[in-house]
């Protein structure tokens, strides 16, 4: 009886560990996809056309001229 109880508890632990590791794997895959999407975003260089949805490279979008430009400080 003791051997059967030990085998049952071991099987329960293995089943629980397997399902929880699958859940973690899904999250790892999502994090990897997020990281890749952040790394592949492109930005518009100085003088390039832009609008409210465009990302300028370390610059800002002048909506009046619709061009990316470096901020000027007085």
Curated annotation (Swiss-Prot):
Disulfide topology: 43-57, 50-61, 56-68
Keywords: Cleavage on pair of basic residues, Disulfide bond, Knottin, Secreted, Signal, Toxin
Tissue: Expressed by the venom duct.
Keyword Disulfide bond: yes
Main location, first listed in the record: secreted
Family: Belongs to the conotoxin O1 superfamily.
UniProt free text on domains: The presence of a 'disulfide through disulfide knot' structurally defines this protein as a knottin.
Protein name: Conotoxin AbVIK
Organism annotation: Conus abbreviatus
Lineage, broadest ranks: Eukaryota, Metazoa, Spiralia, Lophotrochozoa, Mollusca
């Amino acid at each position: 009886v003791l051997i059967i109880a030990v085998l049952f508890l071991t099987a329960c632990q293995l089943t629980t560990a397997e399902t929880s590791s699958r859940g973690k794997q899904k999250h790892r895959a999502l994090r990897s996809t997020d990281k890749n999407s952040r790394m592949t975003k492109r930005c518009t260089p100085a003088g390039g056309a832009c609008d409210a949805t465009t990302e300028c490279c370390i610059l800002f979008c002048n909506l009046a001229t619709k061009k990316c430009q470096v901020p000027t400080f007085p």
